[in-house]
Amino acid sequence: MRPESYAHVWDALQAVRALRRFTQGVSEEEYLSDLMLSSAVERQFEILGEALNRVRRSDPQTADNIPDIHRIIGMRNIIAHEYGSVDGRLVWAAATTHVVALETVLSGFLQDAQRPE
């Protein structure tokens, strides 16, 4: 991983961890009916997608090893620019299932890389 990507991977990992905390112990129906919670989850997806987009631009080799990077960036773009067409059930599914593996990958990148000075 390139040194300049470290901060972006860190930001992405923090967003993933927030997503996991926000959705832990919450049902899909509770999520869908709670505007504050759904807004918080969507915000973390915006951060996650933007951080991964920066990794993709600055460090394509690392980006190639991030599962579903293009889908995550795409979700970020939909949330940010097509907010009226966001499907809460898809966001819920991504937040509760797909980010688990991503946390492992991002943690591994940070463990393998030395933090830049």
Language model segments and positions:
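Solvent-exposed interaction patches of small proteins and small membrane subunits
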Residues: M1-E117
